[in-house]
Amino acid sequence: AYGAQDGSNEDLLYLNLYYDPINEPLEVAEPGNPTLSDPNRWQPLSLARFIDQSGNEIPGSSPPFLSPEWGNVVPFAMNANDMTVQERDGDTYRIFKDPGPPPYINMQDDPEGSALYKWGFTLVSIWASHLDPANSRIVDISPNSIGNISTFPQDFEDYEDFYNLYEGGDPGQGRLVNPATGVPYPEQLVPLGDYARVLAEFWADGPDSETPPGHWFSILNYVSDQEVFEKRYKGEGEILGDLEWDIKAYFALGGAVHDAAIAAWSVKGWYDYIRPVSAIRWMAQQGQSSDANEASYNPNGIPLHQNYVELVTEGDPLAGDQGENVGKVKLYTWRGPDYIEDPETDVAGVGWILAENWWPYQRPSFVTPPFAGYVSGHSTYSRAAAELMTLITGDEYFPGGVGEFTAEKDNFLVFERGPSEDLVLQWATYRDASDQCSLSRIWGGIHPPADDINGRLMGQEAGVAAFTLADRFFVGDTQLVTSIPDHGGMSLSLYPNPVRQGAHLSIRNVKEGEAAHVQLYDLRGVAIDVKEAITYREDILQLNTRSLAPGVYLLRRRDGSTQKLVVK
């Protein structure tokens, strides 16, 4: 079966073969983060009970990193040109669409990177101060006011101009007119506390919810079911039948999110970057880094921000009975699951808490996905899917100029009660939906900005490339292996097989005159040009595998004799 050959380690139930976390687990229910040894690397979480993606309860669990070696999986449209190879502790990591490292905290050698690290993770806590229905700020969440972002910052130093530190959101100005109707998009004014919570939970990938690629298949189904939508491939030509449309759309979207997963998780596994719950607690444990003349100063501490990040002083309600908390860092933020007894009736709200007790806006049985943060899988998946949807429908806009998803009052949120009133998530374009998905992970306390933008850029490339390849299948511009004939006589002999990437493969039982007629195919049936990599001497063909991405291939002689080749 293909799944046993695609590099996913299906035979061993997808277990990690060599990755090990460098940090000891964080006991999330306990204050602070005393077990973190490297504040730039991922930290497992120790939970009283963990409920996994499928809703299975695992008592007393510290979930392992999910798929840090996913760069070994055979991609759909990506190839060796998209890949770099790194080595750590003698183990190989294949990285697709490598964006380079995230900001690291190292005040001695990299004060600029340290400042970006501290700014980004502090922003996550500040945005969590919006997660309260009692928040008096009212925002317009219609396409009239959100979306329509044309460019992304290319450097971490430019992120402060893209993300609004105190107000939340991005520079998107929205669109005045719905192109499908020719009239302006009507305003939709709702409490920011409701919008941010609904957005975070709509796109969440916790227990009993869809994964990010699953969200986009649901969106594809939503689009396909709209009465005003015409199933024209690329928006052109005749209307396709339901079955043909579904096959093409599912095939192409599957290829896009498959490559997005490989790219994102290859980066996660290599850079192994820390999550906000670990970083925020660790920084606050160091102290504050804003004023050397104030209490608890430490260059690695969290920056102070009036009304959001402050020090506990004498007489503060958080000072403690014996003043034991005076000088500690406090945060004005979402107060966490300790303030929720019944999620159907309770709201944690926002207020001052000790920073050592900070939680992301998630359930205490999940807290944070069990894998590294950089880059955001949601950002990568969603941008890849948005590009694919734009290309396959021939229109960047949802049918009718807007996609709508309703959240009913007190009947949508799962982490706590809410929203406090009905609201409708509205996006004009697929890219607008993708961009809001990315922001949802910051409001949810799962990612800092550093995880986001590079994921979007990687997904953008992956989505376009996946559609380009899928289109070749649809229009017939591919050389396909449709069958593997059974021939008698001497079959091809390959050694070594598997072969390590970059090594020479010896191919026996090929006559000198037949060398030009040996063809290599990937498992999609697409021919790969290896003529320049083949030499012939002493009755043996030598194939240099340097240009081949790791994966499974079919090597075929002119008479149809075919052998499977595995490149490691």
What are these regions (language model features)?
Residues 1-480:
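Acidic/polar surface patches and capping/hinge elements
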Residues 485-568:
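C-terminal outer-membrane/trafficking sorting elements
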